Amino acid sequence: MPSFRKELEKKDLEILDLFTISFSIFRYNFFNFFLIAMICGIPIILTTAYFPPTILDPLKIQTFEDFINWFKNEVNEGFYINTFLSWFLDIISILSISFLVEVMINKKIRTAFWAIKKSVKVILPAIITSFIYMIIVFFGLAFFIIPGLIFVVLFMFTNNICALRHTWGIDAIKYSASLIKPKFFKALFMLSFIVFFENVFIISFPSAPADTREGLLYYFLSRVLLYLFDTYFKIIIALFFLNRDFVSNSQKLDFD
């Protein structure tokens, strides 16, 4: 396996280069990335099947008051279970993938369990940081929409920073924003592509009634594949973070 560190330190990579290098990393350590995807994905697949959450219909939500009424009157226990589990396991997944990507750019291979063990050690700061992030984004989306979307882009490195730079809370959020600002539209394009791809994949995957064997099989297969794609996209974001961090710090040293 080649070392990618020098490429990441040299300059800001193009989007295609980030996708290509990320795929190489994904392929070289596929088994362990697959394990992380399944360890973090299977519990959500099962709870969603056994405790179907209430689905938000955007067409029925015209005002903030409509959202509050929907939340009070229609949200079921499945919504709370799946929301919390998805949030928690997504943090574990991002932290674990960040650890694996960092060692792999230095030509080292580690296991999924090694990465998850390291993630558990920083999970509390990451949860606190994620909670602060959600509050900021929620108010941005609730009252202004566009600023909320801007915050999502600016803070996209937050969990990577918690994992790899031992920084959390507001400091991690500020750190992420400082790295993203010079490449905001690049980050926006990447996030937009990821969201678009995942939604198109879900819509286009074959389906059947949920109460049939075929329906359960299609649901399970689509979610497994979706979590694999999601793992690949998280590798891209982790690599993007490392690239921006290396280049930014190098520029600061040159300036000094």
Which residues fall in each region the model found?
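Hydrophobic alpha-helical transmembrane segments of multi-pass membrane proteins
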Residues: I81-F88, A142-I146, N159, F220-F229
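Juxtamembrane transition segments at transmembrane-helix termini in multipass membrane proteins
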Residues: M1-K10, I21, D57-W70, S93, ...
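Hydrophobic alpha-helical segments and helix pairs
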Residues: F84-I123, I127
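Alpha-helical transmembrane segments of multi-pass membrane proteins
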Residues: G41-I55
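Membrane-embedded or membrane-proximal helical elements that form or frame transporter/channel pores
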Residues: F64-L89
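Residue-level signature of transmembrane alpha-helical entry/exit and packing/kink sites
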Residues: N29, F33, V75, F79, ...
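Interfacial aromatic "cap" segments that immediately flank transmembrane helices
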Residues: L13-P43, F113-F139, F151-I202
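Residue-level signal for the membrane-embedded core of alpha-helical transmembrane segments
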Residues: F34, F88, I92, P147-I150, ...
